[in-house]
Amino acid sequence: MSISHSDTVLIIDFGSQVTQLIARRVRAMGVYCEVVPFQLALEGMQRIKPKAVILSGSPYSVIDEGSPRAPMEIFEMDIPVLGICYGQQIMCVQLGGKVASGHEREFGRAFLEVQENSALFEGVWEKGSCYQVWMSHGDRVTALPEGFRVIGTSKGAPYAAIADEKRRLYAVQFHPEVVHTLDGTKLLQNFVLKISNLKGNWSMASYREQTIAKIRQKVGKSRVICGLSGGVDSSVVAVLLHEAIGDQLTCILVDHGLMRKNEAQEVLTLFRDHYNIKLIHVNAANMFLNALEGEIDPEKKRKTIGRLFIEVFEEETKKIGGAEFLAQGTLYPDVIESISAIGKSVTIKSHHNVGGLPERMNMKLVEPLRELFKDEVRSLGKELGLPEQFIGRHPFPGPGLAIRCPGAVTREKLEILREADAIYLDEIRKAGLYDEIWQAFAILLPVQTVGVMGDGRTYEFVCALRAVTSVDGMSADFYPYDMEFLSKTAARIINEVRGINRVVYDVTSKPPGTIEWE
């Protein structure tokens, strides 16, 4: 479901790991942008009709035979173009300059000396000064195309920043999109808002209006089914669709018995009672827990839950009858990855979602969030008036508590885990830390230890606590709680939850660990 935007930046992706970061920086300025892989760049230009283009970095070498190039048309369209890292090198090569393997490779922190004032540096960096940037290159430009001048140099790159201001072509060897390049975001703002003269008037309010109109146009009088879990994405999808088509929407909450304490009831209260959304609550806990009985392999647990979810959802949809559309909370990173320049990354864990449903059920898709990043989905949720407890909540996996219960899952262990997790999150909120943490949760380990309570000996489970900080979940650091917080939280869990006599804190970063334990 594509939406038209008058001022759009096209980002051509050559496979950089930080291409999405460029897009997020541009979106944060209030300017809409799209990422397209280099193979589809020409089609993207014709479809989007961009007002500016950014060429990303890449793991490729410009020198290698068959390495990707940008369509020559972009340099002939009389629109501003910014090349970053590999993007700088192909701009130079394609316009008549030269690139060679550098004797000194630059990876990580470097320093750029500003040689000339430029519209790209205006109000940010001054001639004669030196600034920290982030480099990641082995090749480097050795000769400039006609019309370009050097505006910045570094120890390993004599042409670290270049410009042809008459044609509004700019290129840098460093990465302005990463936080390690000081004031890099301001350089991008200069390119997008000043050099390209884009207005910065794209907002969640305008996205909401345009998306509602598109939903109505696409769906017409047809009925739509939406799987609702209470997570951020499905909650925003449900409320947005309900605003667009009202009672044509029916939501299904598949309660697999693996949700957090009181979670199912909170979802029912908000969406059925407050929003008056047609919501079917399917209590399938016995089915799921019986199927999981005795299973200790985490991948098999995930696949069992995913398979049963599809079966239950499909059965409920048949009971409703007559629905033509299935709503999904597909986000923009999913879209980018599915058509990425390099291809999808290796699967570390199976992802539990409804990806297999449309084919099985012969339904059309409606994906109102497919142009948004996660932080933008939260902003849209605020625009729609969703409570903070839903839009600000930490990520929760589709398989639920089953993967926070390593080993075999039982009803008893789930109840113990629910209580411990609720106490942990309560203490985090009381300490005012919830919004500082990307994700926090308890894990009930398949290990029992000896303890002493009162005059008696205990032999009960170990509870691990996990909390991480992250920007996008791709990498994460453990949260550095003070010992007083950990001591208080551990004491509450041990005193209030029957079945736990020991609490530990996980101080593993990602990588090498993953955020979830299974």
Swiss-Prot record:
The protein's Enzyme Commission number: 6.3.5.2
PROSITE patterns given in the database record: GATASE_TYPE_1 (PS51273), GMPS_ATP_PPASE (PS51553)
InterPro entries: Class_I_gatase-like (IPR029062), GATASE (IPR017926), GMP_synth_C (IPR001674), GMP_synth_GATase (IPR004739), GMP_synthase (IPR022955), GMPS_ATP_PPase_dom (IPR025777), NAD/GMP_synthase (IPR022310), Rossmann-like_a/b/a_fold (IPR014729)
Top-rank taxon: Bacteria
Cysteines joined through disulfide linkages: none
GO cellular component: cytosol
Keyword S-adenosyl-L-methionine assigned: no
Domain GMPS ATP-PPase: from-to ranges: 202-393
Function as written in the Swiss-Prot or TrEMBL entry: Catalyzes the synthesis of GMP from XMP.
Protein name per Swiss-Prot or TrEMBL: GMP synthase [glutamine-hydrolyzing]
